[in-house]
């Protein structure tokens, strides 16, 4: 038989009917072409620029490469995997010799394309990089051992197999009409060009491999096969909700933010700085809370999208709670921007499905009944809601971690980067990250610029060295010596650097009172003595928050229903609406306690099960936020969850000593809004807890949360002060503490300790910075450099939701291992979600979607040693492993004891306190 007949006999998908290999290759190429034709002109221009070809030629070239992703299936190893298909291939004249051990087809794809692309005329380096990229379409490039095993097979292979593969490659190029790109200078393909093909191959394959979208059995010999495949591809993208790009018309600020009567100085500076921008830019906004940074960033996105043709927006925040809080605001903005058109918007973090606003968008995107029109406005299509695909949606709100996974070699990291390509990426609260995460952030900024994206970086506070590192990561050169003006400021880095200083929205003088007695009992008395009013206490650890809540006194558990009754009903803003919606089903849940004098006391931290934490967060925002009824006597005890992005407003605030930037963040929760206040709280006052002996270790454990030196330096800078100007004093204090690190300036009794703690801090910073450089794609040319230290992650073959303790540290945050658990109560012989034994936990058999969601809503992440280490050794129930929602969770029986040496603790779940560790 002929080479053509042999090649056409090869199969890609088994079954009756089967799907020929050439057919699947053309299907995948068609999806790639259809995707690119729906993308903005600027995305297509990037592909053309990558390869030095006219636009149509560049798209055909990229699509042809994508089609070749499965060329490795044209191998005896793969074709022997289905007996019926193997017999057909043998009848077509392709012999099977001795088959050695199994090798994944992606490994063969790389080896085959290295040779064939060079034969085609591509320079060796470009051919090798593209071959490795296309071979990685299932998540990872091949490692040396895999390639060695594959080469052993090739040494005994019949030459007809090579001819069949060469015919397939030429046929794909012929059908697509794909030209060869002109030789690129040094013979290399730029890393961003390789990534654009690499990612497109992966997700085009996901679509083309769905038999409900691309039925098997279609004959690729037909002359109109590619035309039909393009029709199916377009229909598939329409069904999945892939949006066609619509050019944005420039709108005025007031049209998009009608609730703001007049833009402030920050918001007015954005269009002025962006005027004339013709290339992607970095916009750095340094300003305190309350200056409208979010609206400024969203308006910057609109102007950049209208001016440069960016494909969409991703807003990255430090926590799930902050992402949840911003999601409805971004949705409202996009719907005003879209004026009724359909917009694909995803909420991207691990517990997004618990968010009622996001659940509503998933419902809106569900297929309509016959005769029903599709709804306009924001929707969340199910296809994009899958973890690996969410970043492909043009609009998203989520955690920074979801973006940072793009610069770590987790499975399909390159798909995330493609999703961020030619987009406006807003990075909020960048002051909240450690040195390691900041190193990953710098790598992300380098990639965003290379991929044609713009970035808006927002921060309340930033030490000069951190600011410089971020600006230089984008600019690719030193920006030392640039006069950026005083704080608050906006800095634009484009073809040059421009900066504009702003008048603060308000200058608040906060009275500062230091409490040297930090034990919870006297602190509780001090807080109660400050009533009436809305009093807040932000402490540094969950254990301390629980202890302070207890010390405030015995009380009656406060249910949601009782809270509504005491307030005379539920009305007000968004947070109150969430509380109102929860009332019918969750009215009996405990959200706090009532003291004998009528004081309402609330507790908020991260050790509540997810649904309880979310409900408590809504209650806290409703009671201590901007609108709605405000109880006359209320105390909130919280951890750091209250210092980031939550619009809280206290009459009086206590805080444990923390780094100076975080103290300013916390002080921003004082007198945030104009409202009547008790006379004794007419002026904002901050109570600062500093232990008399300056011992931040056991039993406070503040040194486990913050660096000893930074706490000492913050205290040294604040001692003797009785007031703070917010934000007026911020920049000078930041410079003194973070840039003027000089232990010799400390009092004699602290000097040696300061020297030791500064040395430890500098060593940790160096370690974290080096770790970030090693493990991330810190430079673009490390995309396929799997021989270097960054290959550690690839060698682990990490999923991006990996739960193994030994590999967690390689992800986006350094720190102690943790595990997400579902607390279960033993009642009789069974395990239940509730202590009364009404909701049995599904541990065997199949788990329905409703059961999985119920378990997921009860999850809580724990890190107390040795709990994660022990639980991560245990296999989750088999049914949980099959569920995308549950596979990272472990069941934890309440009351279980964990031991480490002579220490032991028992895990309990208290309805008021959350997860508690009791010594035994």
UniProtKB/Swiss-Prot annotation:
Short sequence motif DEAH box: positions: 428-431
UniProt keywords (A-Z) are:
Antiviral defense, ATP-binding, Endonuclease, Helicase, Hydrolase, Metal-binding, Nuclease, Nucleotide-binding, Plasmid
Needs which cofactor? Answer: Mn(2+); Co(2+); Ni(2+); Cu(2+)
Tell me, what controls this protein's activity? Inhibited by EDTA, Mg(2+) and Ca(2+).
Q: Domain of life here? A: Bacteria
Q: What is the effect of changing residue 24 to A?
A: Loss of endonuclease activity
Keyword Nucleotide-binding annotated: yes
**Into which EC class is this enzyme placed?**
hydrolase
Q: Which SUPFAM superfamilies match?
A: P-loop containing nucleoside triphosphate hydrolases (SSF52540)
Q: Describe the location of the Helicase ATP-binding domain by residue ranges.
A: 274-480
Phenotype for residue 138 to A: Loss of endonuclease activity
Q: What is its EC number?
A: 3.1.-.-, 3.6.4.-
Say if the entry is tagged with keyword Secreted. Answer: no
Any idea which positions bind a divalent metal cation? 24, 69-70, 205
Example GO biological process: defense response to virus
Please share the entry's free-text remark on the cofactor: The ssDNA endonuclease activity (residues 6-260) is stimulated by Mn(2+), Co(2+), Ni(2+), Cu(2+) and Zn(2+), but not by Mg(2+) or Ca(2+). A Ni(2+) ion is seen in crystals upon soaking.
Q: Which residues form a coiled coil?
A: none
Which part of the chain is the HD Cas3-type domain?
Answer: 14-207
Describe the effect of residue 205 to A: Loss of endonuclease activity
> So where does ATP get bound?
287-294
Question: What does this chain do?
Answer: CRISPR (clustered regularly interspaced short palindromic repeat), is an adaptive immune system that provides protection against mobile genetic elements (viruses, transposable elements and conjugative plasmids). CRISPR clusters contain sequences complementary to antecedent mobile elements and target invading nucleic acids. CRISPR clusters are transcribed and processed into CRISPR RNA (crRNA). Cas3 plus Cascade participate in CRISPR interference, the third stage of CRISPR immunity. The N-terminal domain (residues 6-260) acts as a ssDNA endonuclease, has no activity on dsDNA.
Present the record's domain note.
Answer: Proteins of this family have an N-terminal nuclease domain and a C-terminal helicase/ATPase domain. In some CRISPR/Cas systems the domains are swapped, in others they are encoded separately.
Q: Which family does it belong to?
A: In the N-terminal section; belongs to the CRISPR-associated nuclease Cas3-HD family. In the central section; belongs to the CRISPR-associated helicase Cas3 family.
Task: Please identify the protein, giving its name as recorded.
Answer: CRISPR-associated endonuclease/helicase Cas3
């Amino acid at each position: 038989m002929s080479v053509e007949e042999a090649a056409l006999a090869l199969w890609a998908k088994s079954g009756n009917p089967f799907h020929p290999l050439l057919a699947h290759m053309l299907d995948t190429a068609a999806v790639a072409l259809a995707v690119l034709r729906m993308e903005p002109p600027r995305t297509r221009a990037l592909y053309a620029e990558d390869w030095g070809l006219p636009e149509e030629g560049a798209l055909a070239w990229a699509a042809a490469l994508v089609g070749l992703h499965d060329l490795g299936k044209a191998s005896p190893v793969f074709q022997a995997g289905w007996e019926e298909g193997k017999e057909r291939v043998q009848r077509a004249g392709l012999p099977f010799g001795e088959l050695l051990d199994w090798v994944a087809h992606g490994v063969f794809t790389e080896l085959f394309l290295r040779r064939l692309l060079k034969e085609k005329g591509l320079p060796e380096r470009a051919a090798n990089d593209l071959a490795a990229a296309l071979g990685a379409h299932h998540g990872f490039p091949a490692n040396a051992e895999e390639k060695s095993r594959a080469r052993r097979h090739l040494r005994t292979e019949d030459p007809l197999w090579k001819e069949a593969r060469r015919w397939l490659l030429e046929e794909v190029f012929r059908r697509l009409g794909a030209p060869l790109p002109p030789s690129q200078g040094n013979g290399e393909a730029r890393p961003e060009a390789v990534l654009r093909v690499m990612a497109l191959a992966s997700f085009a394959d996901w679509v083309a491999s769905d038999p409900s979208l691309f039925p098997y059995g279609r004959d690729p010999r037909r002359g109109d096969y590619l035309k039909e495949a393009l029709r199916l591809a377009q229909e598939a993208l329409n069904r999945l909700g892939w949006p066609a790009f619509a050019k944005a018309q420039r709108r005025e600020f007031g049209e998009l933010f009608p609730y703001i009567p007049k833009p402030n100085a920050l918001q007015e500076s954005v269009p002025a700085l962006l005027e004339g921008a013709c290339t992607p830019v970095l916009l750095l906004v340094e300003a305190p809370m309350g200056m409208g940074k979010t609206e400024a960033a969203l308006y910057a996105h609109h102007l950049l999208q209208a001016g440069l043709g960016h494909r969409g927006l991703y807003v990255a925040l430090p926590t799930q709670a902050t992402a949840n809080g911003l999601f409805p605001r971004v949705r409202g903005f996009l719907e005003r921007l879209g004026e009724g058109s359909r917009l694909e918007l995803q909420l991207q973090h691990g517990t997004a499905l618990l968010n009622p606003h996001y659940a509503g968008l998933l419902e809106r995107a569900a297929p309509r009944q016959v005769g029903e029109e599709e709804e306009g406005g924001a929707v969340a299509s199910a296809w994009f809601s899958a973890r690996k695909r969410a970043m492909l949606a043009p609009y998203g709100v989520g955690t920074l971690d979801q973006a940072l996974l793009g610069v770590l070699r987790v499975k399909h990291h390159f798909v995330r980067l493609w999703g961020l390509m030619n987009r406006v990426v807003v990075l909020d609260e960048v002051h909240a990250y450690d040195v390691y995460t900041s190193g990953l952030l710098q790598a992300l900024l380098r990639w965003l610029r290379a991929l044609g994206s713009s970035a808006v970086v927002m921060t309340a506070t930033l030490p000069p060295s951190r600011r410089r590192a971020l600006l230089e990561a984008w600019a690719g050169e030193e920006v030392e010596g640039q006069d950026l003006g005083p704080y608050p400021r906006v800095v634009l880095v484009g073809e040059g650097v421009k900066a504009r200083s702003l008048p603060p929205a308000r200058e608040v003088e906060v009275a500062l009172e230091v409490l040297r007695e930090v034990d919870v009992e006297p602190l509780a008395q001090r807080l109660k003595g400050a009533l009436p009013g809305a009093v807040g206490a932000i402490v540094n650890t969950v254990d301390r928050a629980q202890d302070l809540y207890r010390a405030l006194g015995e009380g009656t558990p406060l249910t949601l229903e009782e809270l509504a009754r005491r307030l005379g009903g539920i009305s007000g803003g968004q947070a109150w609406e969430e509380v109102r919606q929860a009332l019918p089903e969750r009215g009996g849940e405990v959200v706090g306690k009532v003291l004998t004098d009528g004081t309402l006391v609330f507790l908020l931290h991260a050790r509540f099960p997810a649904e309880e934490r979310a409900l408590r967060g809504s209650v806290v925002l409703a009671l201590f936020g901007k609108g709605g009824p405000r109880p006359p006597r209320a105390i909130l005890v919280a951890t750091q969850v209250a210092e980031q992005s939550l619009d809280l407003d206290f009459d009086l605030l206590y805080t444990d000593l923390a780094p100076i930037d975080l103290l300013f963040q916390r002080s921003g929760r004082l007198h945030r809004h104009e409202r009547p206040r008790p006379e004794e709280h007419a002026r904002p006052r901050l109570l600062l807890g500093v232990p008399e002996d300056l011992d931040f270790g056991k039993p406070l454990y503040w040194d486990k949360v913050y660096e000893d030196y930074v706490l000492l330096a913050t205290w040294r800078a604040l001692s003797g002060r009785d007031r703070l100007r917010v934000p007026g004093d911020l920049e000078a204090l930041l410079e003194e503490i973070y840039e003027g690190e000089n232990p010799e300036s400390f009092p004699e009794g602290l000097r040696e300790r300061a020297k030791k703690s500064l040395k430890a801090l500098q060593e940790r910073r160096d370690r974290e910075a080096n770790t970030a450089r090693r493990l991330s794609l810190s430079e673009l040319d490390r995309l396929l450099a799997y021989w270097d230290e960054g290959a550690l992650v690839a060698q682990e073959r990490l999923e991006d939701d990996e739960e193994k303790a030994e590999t967690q540290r390689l992800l986006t945050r350094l720190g102690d291992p943790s595990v997400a658990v579902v607390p279960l109560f033993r009642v009789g012989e069974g395990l239940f979600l509730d202590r009364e034994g009404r909701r049995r936990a599904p541990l065997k058999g199949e788990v329905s979607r409703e059961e999985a969601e119920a378990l997921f809503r009860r999850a809580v992440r724990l890190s107390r040693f040795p709990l994660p280490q022990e639980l991560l050794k245990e296999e989750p129930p088999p049914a949980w492993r099959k569920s995308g929602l549950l596979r990272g969770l472990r069941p934890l029986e309440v009351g279980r004891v964990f031991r480490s040496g002579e220490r032991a603790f028992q895990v309990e779940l208290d309805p008021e306190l959350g997860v508690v560790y009791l010594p035994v």
